[in-house]
UniProtKB/Swiss-Prot annotation:
It is found in: Cytoplasm. GO terms for biological process: nucleotide-excision repair; SOS response. Pfam families: UvrA_DNA-bind, UvrA_inter. ATP binds at residues 31-38, 639-646. This is UvrABC system protein A. It comes from the Bacteria. The gene is uvrA. A zinc finger (C4-type) spans 253-280, 739-765. The keyword DNA repair applies. Belongs to the ABC transporter superfamily. UvrA family. Signal peptide: none annotated. One of its GO terms (cellular component) is cytoplasm. Keywords: ATP-binding, Cytoplasm, DNA damage, DNA excision, DNA repair, DNA-binding, Excision nuclease, Metal-binding, Nucleotide-binding, Repeat, SOS response, Zinc, Zinc-finger. InterPro entries: ABC_transporter-like_ATP-bd, ABC_transporter-like_CS, ATP_grasp_subdomain_1, P-loop_NTPase, UvrA, UvrA_DNA-bd, UvrA_inter.
Amino acid sequence: MKSIDIRGARTHNLKNINLILPRDKLIVITGLSGSGKSSLAFDTLYAEGQRRYVESLSAYARQFLSLMEKPDVDHIEGLSPAISIEQKSTSHNPRSTVGTITEIHDYLRLLFARVGEPRCPKHDLPLVAQTISQMVDRVMQEPEGKRLMLLAPVVRNRKGEHVKLLENLTASGYIRARINGEICDLSDPPVLELQKKHTIEVVVDRFKVRSDMMSRLAESFETALELSGSTAIIADMDDPGAPEMVFSASFACSECGYSLPELEPRLFSFNNPAGACPTCDGLGVEQYFDPAKVVQNPDVSLASGAIKGWDRRSLYYFSLLTAVASYYAFDIDTPFAQLPAKIQQIILYGSSDEIEFFYINDRDDKIQRKHTFEGVLNNMARRYKETESNAVRDELAKYINNRACLACQGSRLRQEARNVFIEQANLPEIAEKSIGEALTFFEQLELNGQRAQIAEKILKEIRERLQFLVNVGLNYLSLSRSAETLSGGEAQRIRLASQIGAGLVGVMYVLDEPSIGLHQRDNERLLNTLIHLRDLGNTVIVVEHDEDAIRAADHIVDIGPGAGVHGGQVIAQGSATEIMQIEASITGQYLAGKQKIEIPTERIPYDANKLLILSGASGNNLKHVELVIPVGLFTCITGVSGSGKSTLINDTLFPLAQNALNRAERTDVAPYQAIDGLAHFDKVIDIDQSPIGRTPRSNPATYTGLFTPIRELFAGTQEARARGYNVGRFSFNVRGGRCEACQGDGVIKVEMHFLPDVYVPCDHCKGKRYNRETLEVRYKGKTIHQVLEMTVEEAREFFDAIPAIARKLQTLIDVGLSYIRLGQSSTTLSGGEAQRVKLATELSKRDTGKTLYILDEPTTGLHFADIKQLLAVLHKLRDQGNTIVVIEHNLDVIKTADWIVDLGPEGGAGGGQIIAQGTPEDVAQQPGSHTARFLTQILAKG
């Protein structure tokens, strides 16, 4: 078949659509947020493609796979096995890294095991294993007639008299030994000092080099290796100062005997006990009690509470500190910061001195004991380890922090693995390089002879996989980067690169906005990757709003016309040119330039006396930058992926502002020197795209605070008062008014083992969540269930006469959420929808005009028309006097900003600098900025 034929798709809000999609093409599905794009791409096409493949497996195999729900569709023909690449975080496993996800680490392990050069950590000498034949051949290269002796080292730099050893050697028939560099007769050995280190090497054979002695020499080497374990030495009998030949039968250092077993791939795996650092078990980090968290207020004294739980109110612990203060003669009322460094060290880490302590027991008797002081940090660590109380453990956990493991320096690998090199680089050093740098390293790597042959195929796989990651714009990441720290867009592009590496043909790939988090500069490379995937012989279906992606598509499907109940129809399909000619297509109108987001006619000037200045920010790749944000304006933080935007705003500015304005106690602030200007704000709010709730019970009505006044209305009706129902009666979270059969969920979960779990409507309440008595109470003819089933638009009209409710509903309409239902489960909301629910909640609150709002890529999942609506909301917040800081790549947002801070010039180590700060027009003139190049083009369009 040359096409995918869909008939009667009704999944979620799809209106019984019929659609024919070409196979082996790049197809972009676009439309307003909530119009039904994901319902078509993921919940219909992908779900059915995956379901059909999984159903072909045995019932036994199916129980290990999560089978998707059968979509509500009459008929689909022409489907291939489907692979979905979504924007989910790749893994919450701390052992998962970019290298392990992409399997590059597996190839690196194989490479190091086969062609790596082990070295001694102490002497930096290569560890080389030799056969007896190689040893004999080497000796036979010496001049004919040269007098040599073969030694077997049996003791190396070890204390002791070694009397028994020397006696055993004599009994075994050995005549001579070299002891501490001197040849001695074993019949009369020297007396060795017990407390000194000695080296004893047995003379196994003495010979002149002759061509007919190879078999004798081989036997002598066998004896020497057996005697020493694995090492043999050839020394010149006539010239004691001549260089000696050291041979090893195992991977061992010729100087100290440091040895390795045969190199295997598992030695280089931090997920295998053979390779993992024994201190941190391969995690690369270790937990420790952080002095900065323990001493929360160094400007006050120990007596006044510099260390929480050890002040005057805690009789036992304070008595310990009092005794320590008495012994070391310092004042317990002196501020902790003013105590000598040595005293601070003793308080935190303890002392080996015997100190007299006085205790009061249960009978108020004073008891005296003399012992060492373990220190506050050691005390906490011991209690954390020994306690069986979860409450104590949770309290102590507040003082714990993570740091790079001191034993492996965060590399996760044991010492043996860290001391294997390829061209002077070990595995952790390669994993720490950015992907771009790693690719350059392997492209320039030249191995010789047999090593080159062995490594050829492995290197080809490594280079290809690294190139795929560069092609999807991830050259700034390192292979050692933990999967937990990746954004949704980064995780998706890593999976995309892995799929290209797999080289599958005849597959249907479904992607969700792969351009998220990607700068315009990297967009072209991403699109080339998608085209490459198509050219392999695959159907690539992309849910996307990016203009470049839409124009590059072979086939576009525009879903609309509106969102939610107003969407679910195919408005237009075809090429970009065809879409632009269809008046009903909002996407087509924007592509044709008939509709657009206008550039402000004039920029709002900033007040030089009202600035937020963050100095010396140096977290991750930031290079001591100074960030200037004008108060009361709309600021955009721009820059290529990995340039340091999130580190600067999310990891530095936001936690600092939280601590100062919201009374948070965050200690995970990235390094900085100073911050000035927070006095201009009364609170900071981060509006991100995380879910507004993780259970079916949470919904827009409960999150925005709408549900409380609605329940109060129902409780105030004549019927409710007559029955004695209060507000709690109309809650589905507590006993009373809810249906107890489903506990207010409205559905019952049925586990089906090798089929997906089925949620069936509750038999008792028929999915209405409330019991019959509660549903008998009506407000204006509607039950509480019917109100929750209303869309925001319907509810706005219904509650028009109730200002407290109408105002909150209007803010939801203002942010473009008129189509969602009040009781819609939060788990069904997209990231963009969840973010706009949060925005609406903030808009509905009484505004002081002194709020600092931080948003990270708010345009995720938003169509051109949605972005226009979002910008109207952000500009409204700005016009009320608030300060808006947005991390964004979308040029329509950037061009409407009052102020831009552009980071770069590149990602990773090549970034971390502020390239430009100023109005969009100022930044567009900056020659070293990638953002400027694209900004110039869009400003010229007007």
